[in-house]
Amino acid sequence: MSLRLQEKYEKEVVPALMDKFGYKNIMQAPKLEKIVINMGVGEAKDNPKVLESAVNDLTIITGQKPVLTRAKKSIANFKLRENMAIGCKVTLRKQYMYEFADKLMNVALPRVRDFSGVSDKSFDGRGNYSLGIKEQLIFPEIEYDKIDKVRGMDIVFVTTANTDEEAKELLRLFGMPFAQK
């Protein structure tokens, strides 16, 4: 099953990147490697049921069961014990990744209130892009009546690009709505 974004990458994005950056071989063109979605649930230390609903939300949004993230060490001030479940994350690759990216860029982000584009300053220097979302309600699969609490999430686009400029161009060609200066 070939996806719209994957076809767009092969037919439009790669030739455009090769022109702009002067690559000799199509394998030199940067590509999307994976998308990691993380949901930190701090309240989970007091109420484990909260984590269940976060896992549920993430499963509905991504179509893949999340892995629980656990505390690396105990911190007394936060009443946190080592190995306590405090969040969940999903790593999407291949078709799931393209499906999610397509849904995020074309459906979810335009539904954000007062949306004027995502920041282009969130690159890490190695060609990866991070994005924070304040509420899970922007995804059409989440029903407003069925959520117990509004939760945010971190989304990281991992690319094979060597520089931020290459990664930004890759995401821009995919249709990421960067804010206009």
Curated annotation (Swiss-Prot):
An example of a GO molecular function for this protein is: structural constituent of ribosome
One Pfam family from the record: Ribosomal_L5_C
Keywords from UniProt, A to Z, are: Ribonucleoprotein, Ribosomal protein, RNA-binding, rRNA-binding, tRNA-binding
One GO cellular component, as annotated: ribonucleoprotein complex
Query: Which GO terms fall under biological process for this protein?
Result: translation
**Which SUPFAM superfamilies does the record match to this protein?**
RL5-like
Q: Tell me the domain of life.
A: Bacteria
Q: Extract the coiled-coil ranges from the record.
A: none
Looking up InterPro entries in the UniProt record yields:
Ribosomal_uL5, Ribosomal_uL5_bac-type, Ribosomal_uL5_C, Ribosomal_uL5_CS, Ribosomal_uL5_dom_sf, Ribosomal_uL5_N
Please give the subunit comment from the record: Part of the 50S ribosomal subunit; part of the 5S rRNA/L5/L18/L25 subcomplex. Contacts the 5S rRNA and the P site tRNA. Forms a bridge to the 30S subunit in the 70S ribosome.
Family, according to the entry, reads as follows: Belongs to the universal ribosomal protein uL5 family.
PANTHER family, sorted:
60S RIBOSOMAL PROTEIN L11-RELATED
Q: What does this protein do?
A: This is one of the proteins that bind and probably mediate the attachment of the 5S RNA into the large ribosomal subunit, where it forms part of the central protuberance. In the 70S ribosome it contacts protein S13 of the 30S subunit (bridge B1b), connecting the 2 subunits; this bridge is implicated in subunit movement. Contacts the P site tRNA; the 5S rRNA and some of its associated proteins might help stabilize positioning of ribosome-bound tRNAs.
> Which NCBIfam families does the record associate with it?
PRK00010.1 (NF000585)
The protein here is known as: Large ribosomal subunit protein uL5
- Which gene name belongs to this protein? rplE
